[in-house]
Amino acid sequence: MKVTKETLEKSRVELTIEVEAEEVSKAYEKAYKKIAQKVVIPGFRKGKAPRVLVERHVGKEYILEEALDELLPESYVKAVNEAGIEPVDKPEVSLVSYGVNEPLVYKAVVDVKPEVELGQYTGLEVTKMPVEVTDEEVEKELEYLQNRYAKLITVEDGEAKFGDIVVIDFAGKMNGEPLEGGSADNYRLELGSKVFIPGFEEQIVGMKPGETKEINVTFPEDYQKEDLAGKPAVFTVTLKEIKRKELAPLDDEFAKDVSEFSTLAELKEDLKKKIAQTKENISREKMEAEVVEKAVDNANVEIPASMVNHEVEHILHHFEEELKYRRLTLEQYLNYQKKTLDELKEELKPRAERNVKTELVLEAIAKKEGITATDEEIDKELGKIAELYQQPVEEIKKLFAQRMDDLAYSIVRRKTIDFLVENAKAV
């Protein structure tokens, strides 16, 4: 087999592939035998008709096409290996010449993984946030714990106010007609939680147990149900019960009740450490994002359209999954946004291109710096996954048997970003 390679623009390669006549004849013979076992020739049992009759019945061209269906993919894989390229999409194949006892010549144009021209990626300046914890931040965490572990006291005689948990019956109407899904009995609602549409909770404030009131609201313009967006509605609300939080005093007893610590001072110190760790994590994430962004900006790479299109589909798939959690379909979202699917895909292209470039640059840096994933690191990661899902490690290994490359890549990616941060200049 002969293979010649021509490099085209935008990370595309054209392979001219010539398969010897002998190989074509072998493939033709194999295809003929397969067809001969199935074709029905009057006066002969299947597979027993003379060759000339079979070829006349189905046509040599048909047999040759069957042969090419097997010969083309086989020879293409060999040609790719011989040319030393890494395709990222299916090839565009065009036949040049072929015959039963002739060489097969065809061209295959395909997008390949592009070469990355790295720029500066070490010594990059990144901003390191100062990690300071104020007394106010600790007090805010204590206040959260007070509310979380507060006792609920029934208010027999008094008005509802923000922070109270109320039990209500409500029934909504729009244009005098019952609102689908707009009614409930014995519904628990914390006033100020903003669970309901704007204006609803505010109008419950001041109501007393046993009181019934009509509440007028307008659905937001961006409400997820398009038929309700921007429209007014009336809810008949009956307040059945008010429960008010009784906060425990901040003392050593409180610390014992809500934590493993014996004193309030110990609890405060622990909260301070946790806040500091959270800030450290946020600072680290921002440094990582900044150093990766700069390394990517400094690199040059011609990204083929197919890689961008694949990433658009990947982003779109995840977006559809997110919409499901919001009980929306992609079609409903597009109708609400007044967009077509093609318009949405076009909007996603810059993000997709950036994603692809980022991964290519990180991969190139890892290759240049010799960053790899060791067997020990892979085993350690599998152990973490097994612990997370409370499954035996061997079971996790079976599940990841076909995805070990992905797992190794995630480790290499993590190590590469760590390398960039460690070799950056924090300012």
Swiss-Prot record:
Protein name: Trigger factor
GO MF, any single term: ribosome binding
Organism listed in the record: Carboxydothermus hydrogenoformans (strain ATCC BAA-161 / DSM 6008 / Z-2901)
A Pfam family reported for this protein in Swiss-Prot or TrEMBL: Trigger_N
Gene: tig
Organism ancestry: Bacteria, Bacillati, Bacillota, Clostridia, Thermoanaerobacterales
UniProt keyword annotation of Phosphoprotein present: no
Catalytic activities: [protein]-peptidylproline (omega=180) = [protein]-peptidylproline (omega=0)
Keyword list, A-Z: Cell cycle, Cell division, Chaperone, Cytoplasm, Isomerase, Rotamase
Entry EC no(s): 5.2.1.8
Example of a GO cellular component annotation carried by this entry: cytoplasm
